[in-house]
Amino acid sequence: MTNAKKETSLLTEREWQVVRLIQQDKKYREIATELGLGYETVKTYATRIRRKLNLTSKVAVALWAQKKRKSNG
């Protein structure tokens, strides 16, 4: 499995939903409202996403998602 596929398959569908909204520059409270989740739950998802992808910030997650989108066409 390539590194890109390995990274992509690490995330659950819900984590991907959070990533897409982070990429749209949404705040955690906005993401929580949009997905019908609690604020702390969204923060937990964001932390898990950063750990799984070995990233250190919300901005890094957005940049990673943008790169993935471009590479997938």
Give a label for each model feature.
Residues 1, 44, 70-71:
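Generic low-polarity alpha-helical segments
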Residues 2-40:
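Helix-turn-helix DNA-binding segment
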Residues 27-60:
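Recognition helix of helix-turn-helix DNA-binding domains
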Residues 16-20, 50, 62:
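Hydrophobic residues on short alpha-helical segments
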Residues 5, 51-73:
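Basic, Lys/Arg-enriched C-terminal extension of HTH/homeodomain DNA-binding domains
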